[in-house]
Amino acid sequence: MELKKGGIKEYLIMFFLLGVSGIPYFSSNQPFIILFALGLIGLFMLSSFSKIDEELLFVLIAILACVFFQAVTFSYFKGITILGLILRITTAYFAIKLLGEYFISYFLRVMIFLTIVSLIIFIPIFIKPDFLNTLIDLTPSFLSYQYELWGFQVDRKTMVIYNLLQEENRVRNNGPFWEPGAFGGYLVIAYIFNTIREKKLLGKINILFIIAIISTQSTTAYLALFAFIVCYIFFEDYSYAVKSLIIVFGVAGYVAFQTIPFLGDKIREENKGAKDAIEEVGGDTRMASAILDWDDIKGYPFSGRGLWPETRVDKKFEYVIRNNGFTNFIATWGILFFFFYFYWYYKGFSEFCRIYGASYYIPIVMLLIIWLLSFSENYFDSSFFWAFVFIGIPLKNVFYDEEIEDNNNLS
């Protein structure tokens, strides 16, 4: 794989951005998160950039306005939470400024590396599941992280570039991320960007991503990948014969959904068990989380209820888990900020699609797919996903030509 643009610094920026967003060894390490943000600020100050973009100011003003209104409404405010949010936002912004129009290229290259590593480790585990226990035993204790689950502290070991996560009934590829569904989501996003860039659904890089997506056994990732492929074929310049295959894909997808246990059965069980999940563990499924979030949304649909558990969660659900990122985001920030946030996503995606000549419907498809992915993961509060708010800044003055394509070459 040729690295024709940039050097080790740029790849480390992207890797650590993914790290603080979803790789537990980094995302659970508060001192590292702060040092990484300060490092980006320092690099920015040493660079040739002369000003802060107005987009960052718009976002910060909107955030502070929402927080002020919520603090007054609920008579509650915790400054450290807001400082953490601002840190994540500025981390995203400075990463975008330093990586520029090649942000997506660096993302794809790092994801290719992480995907290959994940498959090298996962395949032996899949063949012989006990190999995972061997890796855990061999991993030194300092390569570990802690998180809270239902009020209890949980310790996990990690190889950093592969998270040693154990599940009872299935062997799934979670890559370096906090769980397989999260890895699946990042892989689908990488697949989407690479498809638009290469203008083909089944290039060698995309085949690699598809294999890894299959290995995650993530229902949501499967549905998102299938939905994007169908939409891409429909909206791009494919023949009527190819577009007619959408019907075949649709029938095949429906059959798979009905017959493969971890697809249809998993979702049906979650729907049926949503009420019990709420009562027993405070919403530890996407449907139970959506129901709880909907109760919050109905009370404050426009302003949201804020980042603080004290303004969101009934005491009976003190250790509630809200893992439906879509409804959780609306419940937290309200409908008005929801549209503000994703307006910037749409602008950035539109610029990316313009550069590579994609249909003007594709940015909408990208947005819908990301919403679908978020139904099972809380993505939007992380620095990597905040970066999509600012992705249009370096892209708006870029025009497609052969020189850009050569510099952006992944092969």
What are these regions (language model features)?
Residues 108-131, 151-217, 222-234:
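Alpha-helical transmembrane segments of multi-pass inner-membrane proteins
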Residues 199-205, 209, 226-230, 234, ...:
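Hydrophobic transmembrane alpha-helices and their immediate junctions
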Residues 11-24, 38-96, 116-121, 368-372:
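N-terminal hydrophobic segments of proteins, predominantly signal-anchor/transmembrane helices
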